[in-house]
Amino acid sequence: KLTVKENLMMIARLHGSSKQEAREKADKIMATFELTDRKNDRAKQLSGGWQRKLSIAMALISNPKILFLDEPTIGLDVRARRELWGTMEKLKGKLTLILTTHYLEEAEELADRICIMDKGIVQVLGTADEIIKVSGARNFEEAFLMYTERGTEL
């Protein structure tokens, strides 16, 4: 039943920050993720999109080098998905972000490198353009279908 700010401060404290440092980190990350206006809202009362932003902010408050996001936009409406994409774009170059998704446009839009798997086996790894080129497909969706329908490397 913690507020947005209390959640962020709690995570910072768990990672060794003093109360003052935790407050400063919370304020900074709330500004980064546009959560400042929601700082006194209870986390459980936030919409799905705001909850995802808070979750990512909580994960980042300890300054990790790698962040894993498993289907972060599943179940979000188009507007919330696009807002979260903007949040993820802000992270580029600051840490390694590993994202799992079933949304092809999300992978194509956000990823520097994409790994297509089929039945747990890596089929291809590269940029969206490289995957399209090596597959001979007209677009990324067609390339994805080629790699996943065949189940073998092209």
Sequence positions of predicted segments:
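Catalytic Walker B motif of ABC-type/P-loop ATPase nucleotide-binding domains
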Residues: 67-70
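ABC ATPase "signature
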Residues: 125-126
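Conserved H-loop
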Residues: 94-102
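Conserved catalytic motifs of ABC-family nucleotide-binding domains
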Residues: 63
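Conserved ABC ATPase signature
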Residues: 1, 42-46
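Conserved ABC ATPase "signature" region
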Residues: 9, 13, 20-38
